[in-house]
Structure formats: structure tokens, C-alpha cells
Design a protein with these regions (language model features):
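Cytosolic, long alpha-helical scaffolding segments
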Residues: 1-180
């Protein structure tokens, strides 16, 4: 979410800070979770149900890594994309803020479905994809109708950010689909 906001404001420092603030902590945690889940699956002789839970945790970890890469991609694009209303915090010409907010909620609900075993969270995540698709379609149509020779590079960059946010929502649906 921070990388989306930073890209809409053209704030490269903010975008990169989203990942620098505790990069070592995140890497250490990822390493520990990845290795612990692998060790449990391989060496602990888990029962079928426990093995499935650990396997699902590893799947979520891998999907979260993809989400992190998308966030990095968005942050990297911040310096190359210019939005018309960067000074007005509440103007969002392409719906990126609501897309980011909804996607963040989708990710949270998908992981909650795993943790709580509540399939309602997973189902809600899948339903929220309709909102994301609507926002994406609206932004896509706006970009497509306003592109010209002078702004094609910038509009393509904005479209690329929209694609990354939508892809993050799709990943949350992929996680959620395992728990419906």
C-alpha cells in the first residue's frame, strides 16, 4: 500500500523506504519460516492434517513473496510515472488508492482464512475481486481514451502500476481459493 501511495505522489524516497526500514528483519523472518516449514514437512513425521497445514503455510509464504515483488515493482516505477494531481491527496484520477486499500484487505482476509479456518474470509476475498476488476476496467478505459503521442509512455507506466495492483489482488484470490 505504501508503495502505491508513494508512486502516485512521485515520492521515490517514500517508495524505497517501504522496503528499507526493516529489510534485515523481514529476510531473517522469511528465512526462519521457510526453513521451519520445510523441516517440519520433511523431518517431523507429521500426520496428514498437520502436514497439509504446514504445506499451506509454505504456499502462503511463496505467494507473499510474489506480493512483495509486485510492491517493489510499483515502488521502482515511482520516479518514471507522473500523475496529474500529485499535490491533492484526495484526488485519485485512476482509483489506485481504493484498489490498493481493497487489495490490502483482500490479502489480510486470505491469510485470516488460513489462520482462523474461517472460509467466510476466503469467500469475501473472492467477492472483493469484482470491485478490483471494476476499478481496473474504469481506469483502463480512462487511460485508453486519453492516450496520445505525448503521454503514451507515462500512461503505459500508470497502466503497469494498475496491472501490478490487480495482480496482487489475483494472488490474494489464489491464496483464498485454498480455504473456501
Amino acid at each position: 500500500m505504501l508503495s502505491i501511495r508513494a508512486s502516485t505522489k512521485g515520492n521515490i524516497e517514500l517508495a524505497s523506504s517501504a522496503f528499507k526500514f526493516d529489510e534485515a528483519y523481514i529476510r531473517k523472518g522469511k528465512f526462519e519460516v521457510e526453513y521451519l516449514t520445510l523441516a517440519y514437512m520433511t523431518f517431523q513425521g507429521l500426520g496428514e492434517e498437520d502436514h497439509k497445514a504446514v504445506e499451506q503455510a509454505r504456499m502462503i509464504l511463496r505467494e507473499l513473496e510474489k506480493l512483495a515483488q509486485l510492491a517493489l515493482n510499483i515502488a521502482d516505477k515511482a520516479e518514471y510515472v507522473k500523475f496529474a494531481n500529485v499535490q491533492d491527496l484526495h484526488k485519485d484520477e485512476y482509483g489506485l488508492k481504493p484498489m490498493g486499500d481493497i487489495t490490502a484487505e483482500m490479502i489480510k482476509k486470505a491469510v485470516e482464512a488460513f489462520v482462523s479456518g474461517n472460509s467466510k474470509h476466503a469467500s469475501e476475498t473472492l467477492v472483493m475481486m469484482t470491485e478490483i476488476q471494476g476499478l481496473y476496467d474504469s481506469a483502463f478505459n480512462k487511460i485508453k481514451s486519453s492516450v496520445n503521442d505525448q503521454n503514451i509512455i507515462n500512461h503505459t507506466g500508470i497502466l503497469s502500476i494498475l496491472e501490478d495492483v490487480k495482480d496482487a489482488a489475483v494472488i490474494s484470490c489464489s491464496i483464498a481459493s485454498h480455504f473456501c
